[in-house]
A protein has these predicted regions:
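All-alpha amphipathic helical-bundle segments outside canonical DNA-binding/catalytic cores
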Residues: 16-21, 38-54, 73, 77
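Hydrophobic alpha-helical segments that form the core
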Residues: 44-64, 81-85
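Short coil/turn residues that cap or connect secondary-structure elements
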Residues: 9, 40, 44, 63-70
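Amphipathic alpha-helical segments used for helix-helix packing
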Residues: 1-13
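C-terminal peripheral helix-coil segments that are non-catalytic and often amphipathic
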Residues: 23-39, 58, 68-92
Length: 92
């Protein structure tokens, strides 16, 4: 996360590495959601890209807050909230 933020300061190589890492992570998450849709485990109207972006943004933001506050409360809250959100996309 720090690398992703710092790369805006003009280090194109660092930006590329950080971008590739985030894109790979989001890609893996998106594929997991797509597979869930194909198996009938995830609702068909769910957009894998949106779920992947939401998971990554939530976890990265929670990590930043947890580091700043010096505790794991934000990470635990993010985990619990994502669990509820992911239960909400499950096929019924």
């Amino acid at each position: 996360m720090n690398a992703a933020i710092d790369c805006d300061d003009g280090n194109p190589m660092l930006r590329r590495v950080a971008l590739e890492a985030i894109q790979a992570w989001k890609g893996r998450l998106g594929r997991i959601v797509e597979e869930g849709v194909e198996r009938g485990e995830v609702r068909r109207e769910v957009e894998p890209r949106r779920i992947a972006n939401t998971i990554v943004a939530t976890l990265e933001g929670a990590l930043m807050v947890s580091r700043l506050e010096g505790n794991k409360v934000a990470l635990e809250d993010a985990r619990d909230s994502l669990e509820i959100a992911l239960e909400g996309i499950a096929a019924r």
